[in-house]
Structure formats: C-alpha cells, structure tokens
Amino acid sequence: MSRFEEKKQLKCSFCGKSQDQVRRLIAGPNVYICDECIELCQEIIQEEFEENVEMDLVDLPKPKEIKDILNGYVIGQEKAKKALAVAVYNHYKRINTDTKTDDVELQKSNIMMLGPTGSGKTLLAQTLAKILNVPFAIADATSLTEAGYVGEDVENILLKLIQAADYDIEKAEKGIIYIDEIDKVARKSENPSITRDVSGEGVQQALLKILEGTVASVPPQGGRKHPHQEFIQIDTTNILFICGGAFDGIEKLIQKRTGKTSMGFGADVKSKVVKDIGGLLKQIQPEDLLKFGLIPEFVGRLPVIVTLDQLDEAALIEILTEPKNALVKQYKKLFEIDGVNVEFEGEALKLIAEKAIERKTGARGLRGIVEGLMMDIMYDVPSRDDIEKVIVTKDTVVNASLPTIILKDVKKDDSEETAS
C-alpha cells in the first residue's frame, strides 16, 4: 500500500477500526464514528435513561395522597382505602429500596380483599394501578384449572399483564394483577380430599409459586404449553397480587368463632344480623379463611386482609352523583353532546339505589338499572332537534316509562310531554 493510500484510509475515531472493517463510517469535523460505536453509545444512553426512570419511581405517592385520589373514584370504604394505600405504598417502597446488602429482608405483601358483590373491589384495584401508572390485569379465578385439565393455566394471568404492558417485561414485572372470585377456588370441604379438585385446591396450589415470586414461563400466544413453543420469562417477585371475593357465608364461620349467635334464645333480630355482616367481616382471621376452604399456604401468601362494607342506600346515591366517573355525570355528558340537558330527580335516584339493594348487585347493578331507564330516550334524542331537557322522575323508575321531555321554544305549560 502506498503512503498516499495509507493517508486516505479512514478510521473510526473511537474504536480505531477502518472503514473496511465496519458497515458504515459517519464523518464529522475531523472525526469519524462507525455504526458499531453508535449502537454502543445508544445502549449506554438507554441504560442511563432507565436508571433515571427507576429513580423517578421512588417518588411514589404517600399513603395519604393515594387515599385522597381513591376518594375521587370510590365512595365510602374508608378503612379499606386506608389499608390498601398503606399496603401498596409499602410494596412499591420495598421494590425501590435496595435491601440486598441489609440484614433485614422486606417480604412481599399481597392483598386479600373481602366484600359483597358491587362493593368496589375491582374499582379499587383498577384505580390503584391508574394512580401508580403501572400495568394492570384482571383475571377470573373461576376460569382457572390445574395444569393439564380443560381451562386456563395460571400462567395466562401473567400473559394478560404482559399484554397490558405492551410486552415490556421489565414494566410488567412491577404491575398489579387482580384475581377476582377467588372464593370460588376454595376446596369443597375443610378436609383434604382423595379425589382431585382441579378447579379448587388444584388452582390454589398452582397459584402459590407466582404469588410468592418465581421466574415463570409464559406461552406468548396464551393457551396450553407445548414443547416446540418459545416462552416469555417473567419474574413475579415484584408483581403485586390482589385477590378479591364475596366469600358468601363466611360471616357464619366468624359468628361461630366469636360466639355470637343468631338462633335460639338471646338471638339477634335477623335484620340486625344482616346489618352487622360488615362488622363481622372486620373481625375476620386467617383461620376463618382456612375453614372456608382456602389452603394454609395460600392464605400465608396473602398477608394483608382488607374488608369492604355492604353499600347502603345513601352510599349508592352518592356513587350515582359524586365520583369523577359517576353515572349521572356520564349521562349528562352524553346528552350534552347532543345539545340536551338531563336532570335526575332526588326521588328517582333514591328508587334506583333501592332497586340495586333489592337485586343484591351493589354499585355494579346501578349501570344496568339506569341503562334500562335511559335506553328508549337515548334512541330518540339524536333524531330530534326540538328537545331542550330530559327529566328522570320517580314515575320513570316506578313505571319504567320514558323520562319527562321539555321541548325548545315552546311555552313551558305546553311543552311537557310525559310518555305513558
């Protein structure tokens, strides 16, 4: 090679490789950088960025701040909100604190939530995930079965979380999973059975590892595992599991343990006992869950027990009107888009709440009741431009009739139409 050619040979100013040894060499003022060094720089910057994100996670909301935000979405359940705020704060504080070099090991604090249908269990879990800006997944325990039987494997729960995190495994490993209807996987009797209970005790056994913390292999497309399939590896150590259930009948086990009776001489009046179910649930102990049919190892992995109250009429009316996602506010907004005002009379709201209590559906049943009342008027309004206001009255709820309609540009005396 001539001296002139040697001078013309261009090299990367960072690694010293010549232009023949790399795919691309980019020139700057008297300097050159190759594609390999660009990739390396990108990796270094990405690592630093991720470290900064980790540091930002330390600034998670304090328990009081978490509870204040929950107040905007969930009515009542003050003790439950406080207990959840503390448990969630401690969980993420544990994740963000390096305790590997310490003598003290902070253990995982998964949560068990007990409360009647429609008392706000799912909403609380969803709102917590929203506050903390972490991936969130809901699973139904009734669809799960032990591996090898018809139904869903427990690993499919983790796949839902991975999908919620857009397949960002690192993000998913700090998410929240809510397992609903956990009381439905209680074993059929307190004594271990010889016959296999694939949808009860078998599911509890299968959940143990992921609740405690393990590196699980998840099929990327869901479904059953098979040997020729590649798996996604996910560490569940820092995933917060919240298990919820109605646990119907567990109050009788608590009554039996505490010595309170609702039969025979000295018995409480039945209505008083019903009202006191919430009070009984607050006295729950792990031994009551064992008698209900949960296995000791499973109960041990859910150390935080949170109980929710049965929602009364006043709470249901507040749920209809107060939270940011209140049904009345939602319907007002929907009609407002069509240029129509909506009003719900106080008596109507009271009757809607009473219906939800009768159906024993709690807050969850409110939407179905209101949707039924509003269906016909919501069908008519977009096709008409003469409606100014719609009023949902007591008669609307009692007789399932159309709400009162007030027309535009007509004298008030002549403008009220009440459909029979």
Curated annotation (Swiss-Prot):
InterPro entries: AAA+_ATPase, ATP-dep_Clp_protease_ClpX, ATPase_AAA_core, Clp_ATPase_C, Clp_protease_ATP-bd_su_ClpX, ClpX_bact, P-loop_NTPase, Znf_CppX_C4
Binding-site list for Zn(2+): C12, C15, C34, C37
Chain positions recorded as ATP binding sites: P116, T117, G118, S119, G120, K121, T122, L123
UniProt GO cellular component terms: HslUV protease complex
Short name of one Pfam family: AAA_2
Domain ClpX-type ZB per the UniProt entry, residue ranges: 1-53
CDD domains the UniProt entry points to: RecA-like_ClpX (cd19497)
One Gene Ontology molecular-function label: unfolded protein binding
Superkingdom of source: Bacteria
SUPFAM superfamilies in the cross-refs: Glucocorticoid receptor-like (DNA-binding domain), P-loop containing nucleoside triphosphate hydrolases
Keywords, in A-Z order: ATP-binding, Chaperone, Metal-binding, Nucleotide-binding, Zinc
PROSITE patterns (alphabetical): CLPX_ZB
Biological process annotations from GO: cell division; proteolysis involved in protein catabolic process
Entry's family note: Belongs to the ClpX chaperone family.
Function: ATP-dependent specificity component of the Clp protease. It directs the protease to specific substrates. Can perform chaperone functions in the absence of ClpP.
Quaternary structure, from the entry: Component of the ClpX-ClpP complex. Forms a hexameric ring that, in the presence of ATP, binds to fourteen ClpP subunits assembled into a disk-like structure with a central cavity, resembling the structure of eukaryotic proteasomes.
Protein's recorded name: ATP-dependent Clp protease ATP-binding subunit ClpX
Organism: Alkaliphilus metalliredigens (strain QYMF)
